[in-house]
Amino acid sequence: MVLTNSKQPRKQRKALYNAPLHLRNSVMAAMLSKELKEKFNKNSLPVKKGDTVKVLRGNFKGIEGEVSKVDYAGYKIIVEGVVNKKQDGTETAYPIHPSNVMITKLDESDEKRFKNSSN
C-alpha cells in the first residue's frame, strides 16, 4: 500500500505520521516464518493480537511470545515476555516495531484475514 507517490524522505515520513488508522494496518506487517510462507504464499502479513512472534533484532533478540497489544498510533507491538525491568523492580512492556519480528504462528480465528490466500 502506497501512502504517497513522492520519493522525498520528508514526504514519506509525513505520510506515515499523518496516515489514518485504517491505512496503518498495512505498515504494521511482519515477515512470516518459512512454514507460513509456504502455506499462504505470502512473505509478510499485518501483525494482529494473538499472533506468536519471534524477536529478530535488538536487546530481546530470540525471545518468542504472543502479541498482547498492537499500537497503530505509535507503529509498535507489545509482546509477552519482552519487558523492561525498572529500578524499583517493576516490569513494563517494551514496545517493538513489527519490522523487527517474525510471525511464527498466526491467530486463525478471523476467516476474513485469509480470504485472499491460496489455501
UniProtKB/Swiss-Prot annotation:
From what superkingdom does this record's organism come? Archaea
**Alphabetical keyword list:** Ribonucleoprotein, Ribosomal protein, RNA-binding, rRNA-binding
An annotated GO cellular component: large ribosomal subunit
SUPFAM superfamilies, alphabetized:
Translation proteins SH3-like domain
Q: Which GO terms describe its molecular function?
A: rRNA binding; structural constituent of ribosome
Q: Does the keyword Secreted apply?
A: no
Q: Which Pfam families match?
A: KOW, Ribosomal_L26
Check the record and name the InterPro entries matching this protein: KOW (IPR005824), Rib_uL2_dom2 (IPR014722), Ribosomal_uL24_CS (IPR005825), Ribosomal_uL24_euk/arc (IPR005756), Ribosomal_uL24_KOW (IPR041988), Translation_prot_SH3-like_sf (IPR008991)
Does the keyword field hold Magnesium?
A: no
| One GO BP annotation of this record | translation
State what this protein does. Answer: One of two assembly initiator proteins, it binds directly to the 5'-end of the 23S rRNA, where it nucleates assembly of the 50S subunit. Located at the polypeptide exit tunnel on the outside of the subunit.
Quaternary assembly:
Part of the 50S ribosomal subunit.
Q: Which family would the database say this protein is a member of?
A: Belongs to the universal ribosomal protein uL24 family.
User: What is the protein named?
Assistant: Large ribosomal subunit protein uL24
What species does this protein belong to?
Answer: Methanococcus maripaludis (strain C5 / ATCC BAA-1333)
User: What is the gene called?
Assistant: rpl24
